Amino acid sequence: MHGWLLLVWVQGLIQAAFLATAIGATAGTIDTKRNISAEEGGSVILQCHFSSDTAEVTQVDWKQQDQLLAIYSVDLGWHVASVFSDRVVPGPSLGLTFQSLTMNDTGEYFCTYHTYPGGIYKGRIFLKVQESSDDRNGLAQFQTAPLGGTMAAVLGLICLMVTGVTVLARKDKSIRMHSIESGLGRTEAEPQEWNLRSLSSPGSPVQTQTAPAGPCGEQAEDDYADPQEYFNVLSYRSLESFIAVSKTG
């Protein structure tokens, strides 16, 4: 009795070991790039790599969220959904090439492998669509353009103000110099004009230098005549006066 139970137990162990070996032999794995990124307007490859020693792939389904993208069948080949027929191209291998990406293409993508006798295997990929480098550069230039324009406008305004102040200062200086020169001209002209008017006026006395007259009303011809001559003339005239008086007497 105990021998029979031992035999059954050994047979069970052998069957369990054989079953475990069979399951291990048919088990497979899927490797994917869990997170990928691409630029808007560009393209990206969605790829799931299935590996197994004995299992064979019979069908592969590709979905975006819950929306079918494409199906591959060993018997029927590829079929791409009409909605994505202009942007989805089968390959390489059992993957897909997604073209003309938009920002709305960002999201989760699933690959489902149907195998025999291994069963079904699933993989997940998250795609992030980013703005293209040209758009980013254009946005950066657009953002820096107003700053550059503002700086140029400020510098232009400063230069204009400096130029205006310089012109006004020069004009004010010129006006001041002209006023000073005009004032000096009037100051110099007024005495000359007054003298000319005084000389040309009929009633104004004209000062002339005359030699002093002698005792008999005759003007001395020479202020610096000899004193002896002057005395002789006086004596002669006095003598003539005395003779005239004697004759009348």
From Swiss-Prot:
Protein name according to UniProt: T-cell immunoreceptor with Ig and ITIM domains
PROSITE patterns named among the record's database cross-references: IG_LIKE
Segments on the Extracellular face: 29-148
Primary gene name: Tigit
Segments for region (Disordered): 182-222
Record function comment: Inhibitory receptor that plays a role in the modulation of immune responses. Suppresses T-cell activation by promoting the generation of mature immunoregulatory dendritic cells. Upon binding to its ligands PVR/CD155 or NECTIN2/CD112, which are expressed on antigen-presenting cells, sends inhibitory signals to the T-cell or NK cell. Mechanistically, interaction with ligand leads to phosphorylation of the cytoplasmic tail by Src family tyrosine kinases such as FYN or LCK, allowing subsequent binding to adapter GRB2 and SHIP1/INPP5D. In turn, inhibits PI3K and MAPK signaling cascades.
Gene Ontology CC terms, in alphabetical order: cell surface; plasma membrane
Glycan-carrying positions: N104
TM ranges: 149-169
PANTHER family cross-referenced by the UniProt entry: T-CELL IMMUNORECEPTOR WITH IG AND ITIM DOMAINS (PTHR47734:SF1), T-CELL IMMUNORECEPTOR WITH IG AND ITIM DOMAINS PROTEIN, TIGIT (PTHR47734)
Signal peptide, first to last residue: 1-28
Keywords, comma-separated and alphabetical: Cell membrane, Disulfide bond, Glycoprotein, Immunoglobulin domain, Membrane, Signal, Transmembrane, Transmembrane helix
Residue stretches of biased makeup (Polar residues): 195-211
Pfam families xref list: V-set
Record's subcellular location: Cell membrane
A GO molecular-function descriptor: signaling receptor binding
Membrane topology type: Single-pass type I membrane protein
Expression induction or repression: Upon stimulation and mRNA levels steadily increased during the first 3 days of activation in both CD4(+) and CD8(+) T-cells.
Source organism: Mus musculus (Mouse)
Disulfide cysteine pairs (residue numbers): C48-C111
Motif ITIM motif boundaries: 234-239
